[in-house]
Amino acid sequence: QVHVPLEPKRIISLVPSQTELLYDLGLDSEVIGITKFCVHPASWFRVKQRIGGTKQLNLELIRSLNPDLIIGNKEENTKEDIEALEKEFPVWMSDIETLEDAFAMIHSIGVMTEKEDEAELLVEESIEAFAFLQNLGQGKTFLYFIWDEPAFVAGKNTFIDSMLTKIGFQNACEQSRYPSLSDFKPATVDHIFLSSEPFPFRSEHVNKYQSIFPNAQIHLIDGEMCSW
């Protein structure tokens, strides 16, 4: 149970995607701190206090800002940092594996920040957008690579899998979370997605993966679109 002030005025965001959400909710003056990876919106990145990286938070700097609400994420932030902050400040953590989890997170943050109407509008617009794209994948299979050497993919029970299956693709990886390509042998794959993050796949990687999957279409993809 997190005891949040009725209307928090000093919010710190520990996750880039949730920083964008706070901006979309119109919380410009309320957000006082973001991470060095919170590059969107650019206007905030230029002027907001940066409190370290998602997994290397500057706890002393955070303490000096005296936040009345800290918003983090179970996967992005470390257990040690969060436990330390929870002893001193209200900390709310998201835990997102599916698109539905993301919608629930938007609603919860909207309620906490007195922006419930704005949050509900964002959810409604997102649902409409996904409904429009629901047949984009046409049942084709995919592997979404997040790392190279060793090669890791996004499997089941990940937000990436939820996003792509929602628009009609099928994951060729049946394993959960982020298995190594060496841990399973995929059947025929229609599409290979090489993400821009966390590993920065570039054009020079395309030929390598085309040789591994000669019948697949290889795509360089903006990781922010599938994992933020």
Can you describe what each PLM-predicted range is?
Residues 1-228:
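N-terminal ligand-binding lobe of clamshell/alpha-beta domains
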